[in-house]
A protein has these predicted regions:
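Catalytic or ion-coupling anion/metal-binding cores of large enzyme and transporter domains
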Residues: 1-172
Length: 172
């Protein structure tokens, strides 16, 4: 209930600041979201939700966007169920902001995007610190040099299928 109350307060704060959904949900913000997801190890659900959000704001997003972003985004976290660490560990290590700071430091995020805080991504992550490099690996020591998802195409999935590459064992 506490989280719901805080979410409601945040919505009202955005309303009072005249920050509208289309100010936040831009093409750049959606690509940032996919990049961060790749670094976190990903959820295949991202490839359902991000295109739907993009459609609502008039951005033609398709699953083929995943591979180029994955190829340049290091996988920095190995979270359960695919890995040994949990969301609580990520939070204690500096949270998503610390992951975003790692990515921004190598130019993988658009830091000018407006966020729900009323500040830009860059302003939000400016003071983020990675407190545990075993939970959030630095970009020069990732779990993998590529992001957590891959889109595969072939005779079984001519339009593409999504695999959570970060959960696949190396032998495969």
């Amino acid at each position: 209930i506490k989280l719901a109350k805080h979410a409601g307060m945040a919505v009202m704060d955005m309303y009072n600041k005249n920050i509208r959904p289309r100010d936040i949900m831009t093409k750049e913000a959606i690509l940032n979201a996919l990049t961060v997801d790749m670094a976190l190890g990903c959820s295949t659900n991202s490839m359902l939700h991000l295109p739907a959000i993009a459609h609502e704001v008039g951005f033609d997003f398709d699953i083929s966007f995943a591979n180029p972003i994955s190829e340049k985004t290091p996988n920095l976290c190995h979270l359960a169920p695919a890995g040994p660490t949990y969301m609580e560990d990520l939070n204690e290590a500096g949270g998503v902001y610390a992951v975003m700071k790692e990515l921004a430091d190598i130019g993988l995020l658009n830091t000018d995007c407006m966020t729900v805080t009323g500040k830009t991504v860059g302003e939000n992550i400016k003071n983020a610190v990675n407190k545990n490099p075993e939970v959030i690996r630095p970009v020069d020591n990732p779990y993998s040099k590529t992001g957590g998802l891959a889109v595969l195409k072939g005779n079984l999935a001519p339009d593409g299928g999504v695999v959570k590459r970060s959960a696949v064992v190396d032998e495969m």
